[in-house]
Amino acid sequence: MPDALQIIVADDHPLFRDAIVLALQASLPGCRTLEASSFSTLEAMVREQDTLDLVLLDLSMPGANGFSSLVFLRGERPEVPVVVISSNDHPRTIRRAQQFGAAGFVPKSSPVAVIREAVQAVMDGGAWFPAQKAERSEEDAQLAARLAQLTPQQFRVLMCMADGLLNKQIAHELGLAENTVKVHVTAILRKLECHSRTQAAVLVKALQAEGGDDAATLPE
């Protein structure tokens, strides 16, 4: 008998998570769902789970910086498809989600049937995005390619750099030796083609999504 599908539902609104879990259980009977309400919780789950089949991701969880959680997932578990479910359905946000590696994008205002359709398409090895998308951005493509060169640990260090932490503070935050952090910072600046920590922080700001903040919208 095949193992049950393991799916993470990452969203900071409990009612929305409940609605998504019910939709998943109806369309994928027997699947095992794990719930994350923050980026730190998601990060821990991804590390702990040997087998993971899908992540449904809200972009605006506490601890996340725009598309940073998506970029982290693609770096940490590139074999696991990610479907972004967001109330920020600006055309450029949808296109950027695709360029940063999402397998699908579903607006939170979508009815349950659409969410199920998107999940099934992705689980079948395909992709699912709304019909109307912004044009491809070469700038975003270059940013995605640079970020893809970072190891998961380097990406964590980069997020700390973007928060203005010094090497000593980053070492304490991540449980690393300060010299190790220095080595990571040097590698990060080289891979991102940046001459300073400030330039690297500006690149992280470029991960911000278009439009306003996400808000919980329950599927119909």
Language model segments and positions:
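Conserved acidic segment of CheY-like receiver
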Residues: 3-16, 20-24, 39, 55, ...
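Acidic, metal-coordinating helix/loop segments flanking the phosphotransfer/catalytic sites
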Residues: 35-54
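Acidic catalytic/metal-coordinating carboxylates
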Residues: 37-38, 62-68
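Active-site residues of response regulator receiver
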Residues: 58-59, 86
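Short amphipathic alpha-helix used as the core "switch/output" element in two-component signaling
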Residues: 67-79, 203
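Short, flexible helix-to-coil linker/hinge segments that flank and couple to helix-turn-helix
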Residues: 94-99, 104-152, 156, 206-209
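Recognition helix of helix-turn-helix DNA-binding domains
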Residues: 164-199
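Basic, Lys/Arg-enriched C-terminal extension of HTH/homeodomain DNA-binding domains
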Residues: 189-220
